[in-house]
Regions:
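Short, non-transmembrane amphipathic alpha-helical segments
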Residues: 51-76
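Short, histidine-centered active-site or binding-site loop motifs used for metal coordination
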Residues: 47-51, 84
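Charged, alpha-helical interface segments at or near domain boundaries
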Residues: 89-90
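Short edge beta-strands and adjacent turn/loop segments
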Residues: 23-48
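Cys/His-clustered metal-coordination modules, chiefly Zn-binding fingers
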Residues: 95-168
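N-proximal, solvent-exposed amphipathic alpha-helical segments enriched in charged/polar residues
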Residues: 1-30
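AMP-binding/adenylate-forming catalytic domain of the ANL superfamily
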Residues: 79-86
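Residue-level signature of catalytic and energy-coupling elements of molecular machines
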Residues: 13, 32, 54, 78
Length: 168
């Protein structure tokens, strides 16, 4: 059996849309950690969920297996593996992913954390800028938005409500 191109397989996995935020891909979110070839010839894709309790984890794994199997033409078994260390952080969202979120009315997490220990607290995005008008004069409406990883905010300048990805 020919050796598969792991970079092309990784690109196929990274192109899978996130089931909860379909405007971004798993690659945009930095969820696809590695693609390897197992001893038995199966392709294994390592995935790091955005947080341990993410309800989309199984759907993401199934979508990746389906996409990679289709990419390979069904010639190999495909497995996914959940990797929890290092823990996912919003720093892993690409600049392109942040742009896509903003363009679709979702405030991306702000800033990037400094190197060192990771805080064990979820920020509610007090500094979230409105994705419509850019104002930083926003208020928290609810700590929980349309998905568990978002909060609901409203802009004081333009009055629009919007989802904001919680900084982690």
């Amino acid at each position: 059996m020919d050796q598969p191109d792991l970079e092309l397989i990784a690109a196929a996995a990274a192109a899978v849309p996130d089931p909860e935020l379909p405007v971004v891909t798993l690659g945009d979110l930095g969820i696809v950690r590695a693609v390897t070839l197992a001893d038995d010839g199966a392709v294994e894709v390592a995935l790091t969920p955005t947080y341990v309790g993410c309800p989309a984890t199984e759907a993401i794994a199934a979508d990746v297996r389906e996409r990679v199997a289709a990419h390979l033409g069904g010639t190999r078994d495909v497995r996914t593996r959940t990797v929890l260390t290092p823990a996912w952080t919003t720093d892993w969202i690409t600049d392109d992913g942040r742009r896509k979120l903003r363009e679709h009315g979702i405030a991306p997490p702000t800033g990037r954390r400094a190197a060192g220990p990771v805080a064990v607290e979820i920020g509610w995005g007090a500094e979230a800028a409105c994705p419509r008008c850019g104002s930083t004069g926003t208020r928290l409406v609810s700590r929980f938005g349309s998905t568990p990883c978002q909060s609901l905010r409203a802009c004081r300048a333009c009055g629009e409500p919007f989802g904001a990805v919680k900084t982690l």
